[in-house]
Amino acid sequence: MPSPPLAPIDSPLDLDHLSRMTLGDTELEQEVLAMFAEQAVRLVAAMAALPAEAGALAHKLKGSARGIGAFAVADAAASLETAVRTGHGRPHAFAALKEAVTEARAAIEAILKP
């Protein structure tokens, strides 16, 4: 009998992935989460202000998001990259990216709260 499918992750962050990337160093985890939260806001604002640079900025955000386990952000950034490249669906892809970043930042803020 085949195994049941894995349940989807409800959190916008894969904390197991983050722990593997930081070798379980919780202080480092907090540092990279804080840096990502700040970087994500700056990059999304830059994408809005500099539409010609949106593809490159989305690529940068995608890599950072994958590094910390924010896979929904990474997927949304990849979709925006594709939309920029093809010229189709850019407004929708940008809106989805902003939403994914908002969700990831909320999760990060909850983790970093003292």
Locate the predicted segments by residue.
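C-terminal end-helix/capping segment
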Residues: T82-H92
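Intrinsically disordered or compositionally simple regulatory linkers and C-terminal tails
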Residues: M1-D10
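Long, amphipathic alpha-helical coiled-coil segments characteristic
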Residues: L13-K60, G67, R90-L112
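C-terminal end-of-chain micro-motif
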Residues: S3, L112-P114
